[in-house]
Amino acid sequence: MTAKDKEALELRAQIQQHLVESGNYERISNKLAQRLLDEGWIDQVKKLTRETMEDDNTTNFSEVLKRVEPEAVSLVSANTKNEIMQQIKAFLCDILDTQ
């Protein structure tokens, strides 16, 4: 691992810590969960997971996740992705402004 990689990991850890300590992680996470619920995404992913488990005759978490995750991610609406990304960007801008 290069010094630049280590520095990037340290910066990421600091940002994550600040995100949690400031309460922004919980706010953003709750907002995302509510949006996904309102849009029916959670029900869609549950159905997709159930179908995958039945079709593949497996309950192995890693295998099911590998099959379901790409489609589940693609099912998130552009509006939800944009809204959450804007909240994350605003959080990062606040961090940069305070340093």
Swiss-Prot record:
GO terms for molecular function: chromatin binding; enzyme activator activity; transcription coactivator activity. It is found in: Nucleus, Nucleoplasm; Cytoplasm, P-body. Component of the nuclear pore complex (NPC)-associated TREX-2 complex (transcription and export complex 2), composed of at least SUS1, SAC3, THP1, SEM1, and CDC31. TREX-2 contains 2 SUS1 chains. The TREX-2 complex interacts with the nucleoporin NUP1. Component of the 1.8 MDa SAGA transcription coactivator-HAT complex. SAGA is built of 5 distinct domains with specialized functions. Within the SAGA complex, SUS1, SGF11, SGF73 and UBP8 form an additional subcomplex of SAGA called the DUB module (deubiquitination module). Interacts directly with THP1, SAC3, SGF11, and with the RNA polymerase II. This is Transcription and mRNA export factor SUS1. The gene is SUS1. Gene3D superfamilies: 1.10.246.140. Belongs to the ENY2 family. One of its GO terms (cellular component) is P-body. GO terms for biological process: chromatin organization; nuclear mRNA surveillance; poly(A)+ mRNA export from nucleus; positive regulation of transcription by RNA polymerase II; post-transcriptional tethering of RNA polymerase II gene DNA at nuclear periphery; protein transport; regulation of protein localization; regulation of transcription by RNA polymerase II. It comes from the Eukaryota. Pfam families: EnY2. Keywords: Activator, Chromatin regulator, Cytoplasm, mRNA transport, Nucleus, Protein transport, Transcription, Transcription regulation, Translocation, Transport. HAMAP family: ENY2_Sus1. Involved in mRNA export coupled transcription activation by association with both the TREX-2 and the SAGA complexes. At the promoters, SAGA is required for recruitment of the basal transcription machinery. It influences RNA polymerase II transcriptional activity through different activities such as TBP interaction and promoter selectivity, interaction with transcription activators, and chromatin modification through histone acetylation and deubiquitination. It comes from Eremothecium gossypii (strain ATCC 10895 / CBS 109.51 / FGSC 9923 / NRRL Y-1056) (Yeast).
